[in-house]
Amino acid sequence: LGYPAVELGHDPKLDAGLGRLSDNATGARLADLTDFEWDIVYVFGEGDPADEINHAAGMKIVRRGRFVEDSVCLFIFKLDGKVVRHLRAPQIVHPGMGDRDVRVEPARTSPKPVSLELVYPDR
């Protein structure tokens, strides 16, 4: 099964920020929700193929098959091509990828909780 091959971290600042955005149906730069350096992020959800996740990470994050973690999404943050964090977060963010300019914005506002997606301003 697609259980994590590594211990997935947890970032209270990221979780709290995502929760606030979802609760208030507002957006923010993802970089403002983190306190570590990164230049690219990948977000994966339950059921995403292990091969895609491991390829994006450049290392084995998920054993095989598909990512299996109930109500969790996986954030992989990289800096200069190397993974600096692999974090679990509430499954309120749609899968996607972006750089430090990417914003987290409401994807839908009803029903609650609000789901979020990665978007670029003016693109």
Language-model segments: residues:
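Mature extracytoplasmic domains of secretory-pathway proteins
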Residues: 22-88, 92
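C-terminal partner/receptor-binding element of secreted or periplasmic proteins
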Residues: 92-123
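Extended hydrophobic/Leu-rich segments
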Residues: 8, 30, 53, 116-119
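Long, low-complexity intrinsically disordered regions enriched in Ser/Thr/Pro/Gly
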Residues: 15, 27, 35, 109-113, ...
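N-terminal, charge-rich interaction modules
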Residues: 2-33
